[in-house]
Curated annotation (Swiss-Prot):
It is found in: Cytoplasm. This is 3-hydroxyacyl-[acyl-carrier-protein] dehydratase FabZ. One of its GO terms (molecular function) is (3R)-hydroxyacyl-[acyl-carrier-protein] dehydratase activity. The keyword Lipid biosynthesis applies. The keyword Phosphoprotein does not apply. SUPFAM superfamilies: Thioesterase/thiol ester dehydrase-isomerase (SSF54637). Involved in unsaturated fatty acids biosynthesis. Catalyzes the dehydration of short chain beta-hydroxyacyl-ACPs and long chain saturated and unsaturated beta-hydroxyacyl-ACPs. It is an enzyme of class 4 (lyase). HAMAP family: FabZ. Its EC number is 4.2.1.59. One of its GO terms (cellular component) is cytoplasm. GO terms for biological process: fatty acid biosynthetic process; lipid A biosynthetic process.
Length: 139
């Protein structure tokens, strides 16, 4: 899935669209990526002399990736809402030039609520992991 297809599914836009492409996708799992550039707006303040991608934005990228997994087959007018986070851990810095990989898997589904396990890696090293909750709402 390329960026044009992603933008047809997700409501997010620059500078807050944090997924550049999808590498793998099936009913229960997704693998997507973000090419982290020095031109990202958040690097202006986080931190100018030592740029690091904020952990909360890594988790937001996971949530957006979850939205792609959950909305890939719908033609309804719905949006994914990030409703919760558990067990978040940040293990390695994400820096300009990194290719950040998001791997997400559905753990539970109840009505329009989903719990997913997310792992973010750079060069196969875990940068962050979390369990996230996403709700699907008609817009």
């Amino acid at each position: 899935m390329n960026i044009e297809e992603i933008m047809k599914i997700l409501p997010h836009r620059y500078p807050f669209l944090l997924v550049d492409g999808v590498l793998e996708l099936n009913e229960e799992k997704i693998k997507a990526f973000k090419n982290v550039s020095i031109n990202e707006s958040f690097f202006q303040g986080h931190f100018p002399n030592y740029p690091i991608m904020p952990g909360v934005l890594i988790v937001e990228g996971m949530a957006q990736t979850a939205g792609l997994l959950l909305l890939k087959d719908t033609d309804e007018n719905v949006i994914p809402l990030f409703t919760g986070i558990d067990k978040a851990r940040f293990k390695k810095e994400v820096r300009p030039g990194d290719k950040l990989i998001y791997d997400l898997e559905i753990l539970q589904k109840k009505a329009n609520m989903f719990k997913l396990k997310g792992i973010a890696t750079v060069e196969e090293q875990v940068c962050a992991q979390a369990e996230i909750m996403v709700g699907i709402k008609k817009s």
